[in-house]
Swiss-Prot record:
<dbReference type="GO" id="GO:0034363">
    <property type="term" value="C:intermediate-density lipoprotein particle"/>
</dbReference>
<dbReference type="InterPro" id="IPR008403">
    <property type="entry name" value="Apo-CIII"/>
</dbReference>
<dbReference type="GO" id="GO:0006869">
    <property type="term" value="P:lipid transport"/>
</dbReference>
<keyword id="KW-0445">Lipid transport</keyword>
<feature type="signal peptide">
    <location>
        <begin position="1"/>
        <end position="23"/>
    </location>
</feature>
<keyword id="KW-0325">Glycoprotein</keyword>
<keyword id="KW-0558">Oxidation</keyword>
<keyword id="KW-0730">Sialic acid</keyword>
<dbReference type="GO" id="GO:0070653">
    <property type="term" value="F:high-density lipoprotein particle receptor binding"/>
</dbReference>
<keyword id="KW-0443">Lipid metabolism</keyword>
<feature type="region of interest" description="Lipid-binding">
    <location>
        <begin position="68"/>
        <end position="96"/>
    </location>
</feature>
<dbReference type="GO" id="GO:0034366">
    <property type="term" value="C:spherical high-density lipoprotein particle"/>
</dbReference>
<dbReference type="GO" id="GO:0055102">
    <property type="term" value="F:lipase inhibitor activity"/>
</dbReference>
<dbReference type="GO" id="GO:0010916">
    <property type="term" value="P:negative regulation of very-low-density lipoprotein particle clearance"/>
</dbReference>
<keyword id="KW-0850">VLDL</keyword>
<protein>
    <recommendedName>
        <fullName>Apolipoprotein C-III</fullName>
    </recommendedName>
</protein>
<feature type="site" description="May interact with the LDL receptor">
    <location>
        <position position="41"/>
    </location>
</feature>
Amino acid sequence: MQPRLLLLAAFLALLVLPEATKAEEGSLLDKMQGYVKEATKTAKDALSSVQESQVAQQARDWMTESFSSLKDYWSSFKGKFTDFWESATSPTQSPP
C-alpha cells in the first residue's frame, strides 16, 4: 500500500506543479509589464521635459528678437522725431 501512496503523492505533485509554474509566470509577466510601464512613463516624462525646454528656449528667442526689433524701431522713430523737433524749435532768421 505504501507504493500506491507514494505514487499518488507523486501524481498529485505533478498536477500541482504546472499551476505553481503558471503562477510564477504570471507574477513574472506582471513584473515585466510593471517595469515596461514605468520605463515608458520615465521616457515620456523625459521627452516632455525636453520639449518644454525647447518651447521655453523658442519663447525666449522670440521675445529677444521682438524686443530687439522694438528697440530698433523705437531708435529709428526717436531719431526722426528728434530731427523734426529740432528743426521746428530752431530759431528762424527773420528777413531784413
